[in-house]
Amino acid sequence: IQELFASRGFTTGVRNGRRVGFFHGTGHGLGLEIHEHPRLQKVVLKDRQVLTVEPGLYYPGVGGTRLEDVVVVTKTGYRILSRFPKQLEI
């Protein structure tokens, strides 16, 4: 994800001693608790697991954003359960 963001001009690194850009996890499992395993890293996902996909960008002095989708893993891929429109408003 860092490479994708960097290719579009949103770099990750340290500025003035603070982390900037995309520096946290991509998402996690959902269940009885809000934050459950698996953490979205290099893991094998299983059919019917429910996960969040929530990349975010943060730049001190500018602001930050995080878009979150809830998805369910299927035998053939995934299905997005979130139905919130994604529209940029400044």
Predicted features along the sequence, with ranges:
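Active-site cores enriched in adjacent His and Asp/Glu residues with nearby glycine-rich loops
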Residues: 1-27, 31, 49
